């Protein structure tokens, strides 16, 4: 593969350059990082990463910044820790809060700490399929990366030590704590292709500015603060919309091939009104009107404060916190002009008995009155608005302002009106209406809604540390909250428009919020009991209260079927939910003999809604020689469902489908035979080797196995209507939808429900490898070499059987088909290897990182006969950064991620329409190519006209190469 070959050549070239350059400038090596005293994974004071019995990686600011090209902590960790997977993009609101995970498990199974204390969750629940589905974990992007001193990543189950959701591991973020000095940094970058490989109308540029400073707090304290501003533009990498470029004007939904023309373009039956191409050709981004696949646009402003004061050697206080505001916009699927159209009435010519022209309208349902002499009126929610004045005058339904068609006389059935400006809509054959009656069209060129979020997030912790009777105490209280106000812009409510001929274009959808209050007290005491080390006893208690709320949106957003793209949160789905839990733990750590470390921990938790649980952990390390050691862990874990998993409800609307997410703990879900959620349980094993065969060479190999039972996942869609191959159970789905108080779009070809449930059991197995070696080339510089790799497999075991009531409605119904299982097992590549060379010489520095990804297997559509395999081949991605210290305080860095501009493989091509016989059904899950205008290999994958050129949830940035520059001033 050319990209892999070129990547390896660059790595070799930079290594050679490091050997011919001229005295080395000392910097923190990976070996020195291993000697950093850690606070994660152990209660023993003074423990280093190199001596730890648990596998832990320490990443300083150099490791996080050099060669990553990002100021987002989530992306920085994703670039440097192979077992840490950072989501690249998502759909809908999932694109507004991207998630990350350890070892391919749910993001909910990774605990995030800041300065050793629990971080609150995001309120934004990822309900779309694919990577991170069901997660509402802590949002790492809201912590200013410029405020971070280092990060400790514990790759081991630690629920018994830190809390019952630390099944996969722990990410502990340690903030800077300086009392003097500071830095000012600015970053700017853009993609090679200015917004992906589909050509672009979206640029994808990014900007970042940060300022941090440490101040003395009287004579014995510090106050370190940071402010950061980030901006990212839209990018777009979807394919061409066949409805735009196909002369047959493929209508929405299930389409039937009726023949093939001489040019190879399929002739499709028309289910609904056709739209002339000349109306839509001027859309922004034509013909790639679907911009749902790509980066969101956002502005993020965040701040951080970390302060402490030592009153004496035995008593100190501390406080730290973060605050952030995000304004983000995510593109949605393009809608054709016929998506929001109102019929104005049947045509009745002027006559003595009908002086007002067509449909004088004794019923307000007619929606429009016209006069042979000119004026017409649009019906509003309060009745008709009579409009005196010029012929053709009317109301703009979005603004209420008077508009004019500019046409004297009556309106005929051959006419369409632009609802936003009152102008007649031209077509290739004149002002031809979509149907047999005059029609009011809200978006004559179609429209592309946006889901918008205005997020406010904050957390603060205050505490004290003191010594009493030989015990070291740490008492802390913390409170965090995340509030998301959600909007849908550039949209409209179809049924409201039909009923009233008026609709807002922008909607307030409502809000979702999550908060967490935590109070903890920890105490440790070393006891000398005659062994090789003191017995360190740690005890602690925690009280926590979590809340989750959904706030009602604009009633016009949820009126009947609701606004296009997202109908908001109705009153029936709003509410605030809470629970409390109380925990206590005890931890014993000792070295019975000099070569052996033992750590045993136990934890008891009580949940007000789930009762009690007891979990434990045993960790051991044995140093065979000073150079070689073995280590291992056995642990159990427990994760209660998040409140979002229990109570979230919303309707997801696409141009051709409407799906209701049922609250797991609701009467509607119970009607479908679903029971309330239960906690997940886990059992983990790990065994590793630690080696120091040379003075500066260190290596670790850790194998692991994590079994999770009652895993909480989102079900496949159970449909009330749909096409062959779907799970269809209308006798259950329609009553459940009605009980939930929701009206779905009657034009949707697929309508159904999903819900979270304890659906599967999984077994995750793999191995983590790290090798660190600094090489001093004398006059040619110092190179820190790091090799890090992860091999990970996921196997789905038990599947929850469908409830009897669902099987009675449809004997073939299942919550998890083979496609769903395949997605769980292959959502990330099995293999990832990072090779990093970090070189310094006097004022110069350079970093080369080669990331090798193994193959990934995926399908574009649901499990039906048109599944299109999309196997992504293994690939090598090269990152390169060069640095120069202009002065002792000023540094310039220039770099590129994905130097060779590699993109994921284009999805496998579908069969050409010309090869399909007349009468063939084109399902929404996978279709044929519609004509010669479609680029080679592009595949239309759903009835929305959306074309995925790369699978959703790709493992590296599908936008391709990214170049950047960074300037930093230290003082």
Question: In which residue ranges do the predicted regions lie?
Answer:
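Extracytoplasmic beta-strand/coil segments of soluble accessory domains associated
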Residues: 46, 77-123, 165
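Outer-membrane beta-barrel signature, preferentially recognizing the C-terminal barrel domain
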Residues: 569-581, 623, 627, 637-700, ...
